[in-house]
Amino acid sequence: AEEAKGIVKGDTEVNRMERDIEHRCMTLLLRQQPVASDLRFISAAMKVVTDVERIGDHAADIAEIVPHLAGVRKAGDPAVSRSIEMGRKAHKMLQDAMSAFAAEDEAAAKSVIDADDAVDYDFNTIKRMLAAEIAADPSKVDAALDVLMVIKYLERIGDHAVNIAEWVEFLRTGRYHHEKMF
């Protein structure tokens, strides 16, 4: 419960950092008038910081749900176990996306994009497990919906990691989704 509270409090700090980074980027744009790769970096950084802020929001939402789940789901619960594994995958995607962005590593970014299929697969598998659970015992609907919310947030975290990875191509080439931007 304390860890969950810490995550929720941390979201406020993430929001503050987002504003600070955006302010710094705008200051650079206005004062330095960057061109080419510098402009691409600043533009991509502003996009990435938005994704990171949203990931923080999702983490805070998960942290608010998890303490309740601990009271209604049993240890070894298959849906919870699979959700934990899904969370590990989404977390690794985020770490790898941030590393790929920092290193401007297109191959690493591509690996992040490819990894999203596994997170999406887990989401759909767990969703089906929960639907079957509710069909078998409608009294479990509230606990199942809490797990469903958690896995949806995890799936969105994976999507934001993909967004971050997609900005690597832009950093290197000025292309985003294979379209020349500048």
Task: List the predicted regions and their residue ranges.
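Cytosolic, long alpha-helical scaffolding segments
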Residues: 1-182
